């Protein structure tokens, strides 16, 4: 991770040492030696400072189709463990069931458990969580929830998960009613997820809607 410039030289000379950006949570070290043509040697230890503990998502937003299904959310971290939690919005909240496990640096890891082999010590790793079997949205409103990812040190990343609005639907419990000569009231029960209005229509329109 260290660049030496120049790598070789003669007599008195200033040598520059620079490093690649370090994303690991722990300091890293490289040991170097310099040797003359005559066999004299000296050693140098180069330390690079640790990066701050971090967790972040690849995107602040994720989406679910109105028909439901799965949604995968990814990000990066260098923490020793990650804990996932979901909070539905107060209005039009989306209910999500978190899985027991997620993937950290390619390894299946339990939510909130210490990550095997501590990959974050050396650098940032990729994490991924898949929320499965999101039900269809039967409302005409978008539904939202917040996925919160918390690192061991308390750092957080939030992702807003939005499910597209469902289709407007309406059902009647009868196709035909027959009023008596006095016009005595009868009831048709309407089941809908939307506002609705009655209006007169042509007979052919009604028959077509009924599939006749």
Model segments located where?
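A short beta-strand micro-motif common to beta-rich folds, especially ectodomain repeats
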Residues: 15, 26-38, 129, 140-153
């Amino acid at each position: 991770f260290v660049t030496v410039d120049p790598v070789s030289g003669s007599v008195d000379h200033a040598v520059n040492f620079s490093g690649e950006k370090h994303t690991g949570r722990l300091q890293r070290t490289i040991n170097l030696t310099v040797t003359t043509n005559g066999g004299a040697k000296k050693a140098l230890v180069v330390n690079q400072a640790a990066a701050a503990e971090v967790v972040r998502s690849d995107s602040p937003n994720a989406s679910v189709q109105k028909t439901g299904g799965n949604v995968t959310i990814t990000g990066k971290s260098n923490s020793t463990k990650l804990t996932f939690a979901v909070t539905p919005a107060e209005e039009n909240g989306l209910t999500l069931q978190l899985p027991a496990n997620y993937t950290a640096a390619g390894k299946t890891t339990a939510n909130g458990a210490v990550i095997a082999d501590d990959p974050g010590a050396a650098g940032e790793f990729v994490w991924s969580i898949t929320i499965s079997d999101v039900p269809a949205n039967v409302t005409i409103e978008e539904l939202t929830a917040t996925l919160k990812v918390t690192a061991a040190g308390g750092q957080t990343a939030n992702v807003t998960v939005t499910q597209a609005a469902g289709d407007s639907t309406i059902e009647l419990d009868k196709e035909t009613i027959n009023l008596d000569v006095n016009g005595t009231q009868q009831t048709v029960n309407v089941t809908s997820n939307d506002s609705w209005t009655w209006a007169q229509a042509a007979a052919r329109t009604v028959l077509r809607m009924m599939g006749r």
